[in-house]
Structures are given as C-alpha cells and as structure tokens.
C-alpha cells in the first residue's frame, strides 16, 4: 500500500516535538536520527545569509494566568524550533509588555551566537528625542545579552512616523551603528498603504523590510496594508522581504467549513494554516515568514509545512483565491489582534 509522504513527514515532526518537549531543564533533547530536518531555507544575495523560511515570532508565547510568559513551555518551543532548523527569531521592545526581549535573551544565551539570526525593533512611539532612541538601543542589547543585532528594524512605520525618525537623526544614527558592526542588517516594518510604503522603501538603501501579507490582505483598501503592490515594490527595488501576520492573527488557521471547502477538496489532510503559509512562501522574494507559535500543536504543524516546502500549484492557487473571495464576503473588520492600532479605530 502506498504511503502518503505528507503523513510520514508529519509523523516524523510530531515525534521530534514529542521528544524535545519531554523537557530536560528547558533544553531541547533531540535523538541523533532527528537532528537534521529538511527545513526550507532561503539564500540572501549578500553576506552568505541563509535564513529558515519559517521564522519564530516572539510576540505570542504561551502565558500563565497572571499574563506573564510561561517560560518553561516557551523555552521548550524555541528549542524545538531551533533543533528542527529554524534559525530566525524575531522579538521587539514592547512584546509581552516588555518581557519578550529579556526572556529571549536568557534562552539564546545557551545557544551558539553564530547558530541563529536575531531580530528586534526600535519603538519610535517611545522616542521623543535621539537620546531616547540611543538609551533604548543600549537597553535592548543588554536585555538580549548580545553585542550586535542581526536584523534591526524601525518598528511599525508609516510615512509620518518615518519622517519623524529622520528629522530626529535616528535613521542616520542607526546606519552609523551598522557601520560600527552593532547592527548587521538594517530595515523596517511597515503598516501603511502602498503609497506610504513606496515612499519609505525608495528613500534608503534598506537591507530588508517587513510587511503584513497573506491571501486576504492583498489590496490596500485598509490604510495600514500595502498588499500585492507592496510585494511587487520589494521585487522592483531588490529589497528582501520578511512577512508578518501570514495567518492574519489566526484567522486563516481555523476557517469556516464553506470557506475551507475548495482547499480540502484538493488536500483533505492539510491544515488551514498550512495553506496560508504555503501561499506566502510561494512568493520568490519572501525570505522569512514569521509565525507567533504559542502552542505545541501550532509548532508541530508549521514544522511539517516547512519540511521540504512545496509551493502552491496553479490549481491550489485558484482554490486559495476561492477561499479568499468567500472570506472577504463575510469579514467586516480584518483584525489580527496585534494591537498596533489601539485605541481601536472601529470602537
């Protein structure tokens, strides 16, 4: 009887996660046969950078009843991901009410520094002056326990916020930090329409940028989304792209039956989340797809998706477009739960 290769792959990933999540003081324990997973990687045309296509977003760790990070579970998740080949870890100054960076720093202190890429971001809303930004940058290095950041971003830019950062001298100062070796790659994350994004993108020789992109957020009807045009601009400008919210804050991980029907007709055993991730990963200029995995089953599923990654076929792309059309007819407010827009503009 022929075996389903996807089922075999998922079984292997589940076995890896089960083994690693039998925690030994929070450290990953991986049997030798499982040490090398076929994690999809993307090569950058500079500095021999090779990132895992799946990146770990450190904004949605499992939490305890009091809202603090469940550090034992979260560390096991991070170690499991790294053991399976994930090498890009993305945090930020405000994540988990300021606790993500210190926690991530404690975990990565147990890893070899050259074995992973670390990303964090400058919170411009906390910067009334360049001195504020300098203080925060030094604090981030201290929190993370490192002397350089692999990928450093201006956080959550729109055109007006970017102009403010330039006017205070922050953009120039961060380029100076790159020249000094304290930043290896300098970029930005953006929550603006395609016109605002294009203005920022073309204004500096950015090393990379980060956008919200998924099969629902393809136009820029919402003022904070740059959509397909934003993606096209990154190709035109030759700027490597990192994707946030590929599953739209979980919306695309649990679809209504009617919406999922075109997908399940082609791959009955594939999860809804895997379709969303494969749609994003099928774009050639996408170098990292961030996923904020807060539970073991989410990590297991995502590792299975990115083990020997398969781009969408033409028929699968058409099925995703059917699903997107159905969802657009039903969804009134496209909230991802990121809280960047608070207070909520929709009330």
What residue ranges belong to the model's regions?
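Short alpha-helix boundary/capping segments
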Residues: 1-6, 241
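N-terminal binding-site loop/beta-alpha segment at the start of enzyme catalytic domains
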Residues: 17-18, 24-30, 34-116, 173, ...
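Conserved, mostly hydrophobic/aromatic
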Residues: 44, 56, 89, 104, ...
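Short, well-ordered coil/turn segments that N-cap beta-strands
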Residues: 49-54, 85-88, 112-116, 146-150, ...
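Active-site mouth loops of central-metabolism enzymes
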Residues: 60-72, 121-131, 260-267
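Short, acidic/polar
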Residues: 68-81, 129-144, 192-200, 272-277
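Beta/alpha (TIM)-barrel catalytic core signal, keyed to glycine-rich beta->alpha loops juxtaposed to Asp/Glu
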Residues: 97, 157-343, 347
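Active-site groove signature of glycoside hydrolases
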Residues: 144-160
């Amino acid at each position: 009887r022929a075996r389903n290769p996807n089922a075999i792959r998922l079984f292997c990933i589940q076995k890896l996660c089960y083994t690693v999540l039998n925690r030994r003081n929070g450290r990953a324990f991986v049997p030798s046969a499982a040490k090398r997973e076929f994690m999809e990687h993307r090569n950058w045309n500079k500095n021999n950078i090779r990132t895992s296509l799946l990146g770990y977003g450190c904004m949605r760790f499992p939490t305890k009843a009091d809202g603090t990070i469940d550090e034992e579970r979260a560390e096991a998740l991070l170690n499991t991901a790294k053991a399976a080949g994930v090498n890009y870890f993305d945090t930020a100054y405000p994540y988990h009410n300021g606790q993500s960076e210190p926690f991530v720093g404690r975990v990565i202190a147990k890893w070899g520094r050259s074995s992973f890429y670390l990303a964090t971001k400058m919170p411009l809303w906390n910067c009334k002056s360049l001195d504020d930004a300098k203080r925060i940058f030094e604090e981030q290095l201290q929190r993370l326990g490192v002397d350089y950041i692999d990928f450093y971003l201006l956080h959550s830019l729109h055109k007006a916020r970017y102009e403010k950062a330039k006017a205070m001298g922050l953009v120039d100062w961060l380029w100076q930090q790159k020249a000094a070796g304290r930043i290896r790659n300098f970029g930005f994350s953006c929550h603006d329409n395609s016109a605002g994004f294009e203005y920022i993108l073309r204004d500096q020789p950015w090393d990379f940028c980060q956008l919200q992109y998924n099969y629902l957020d393809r136009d820029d009807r919402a003022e904070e989304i740059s959509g397909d045009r934003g993606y096209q601009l990154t190709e035109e400008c030759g700027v490597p792209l990192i994707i946030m919210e590929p599953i739209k804050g979980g919306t695309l991980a649990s679809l209504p039956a009617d919406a999922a029907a075109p997908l399940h007709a082609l791959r009955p055993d594939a999860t809804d989340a895997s379709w969303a991730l494969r749609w994003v990963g099928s774009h050639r200029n996408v170098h990292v797809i961030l996923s904020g995995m807060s539970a073991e089953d989410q990590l297991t599923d995502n590792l299975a998706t990115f083990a020997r990654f398969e781009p969408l076929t033409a028929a699968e792309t058409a099925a995703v477009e059917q699903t997107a059309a159905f969802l657009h007819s039903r969804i009134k407010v496209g909230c991802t739960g990121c809280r960047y827009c608070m207070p909520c503009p929709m009330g």
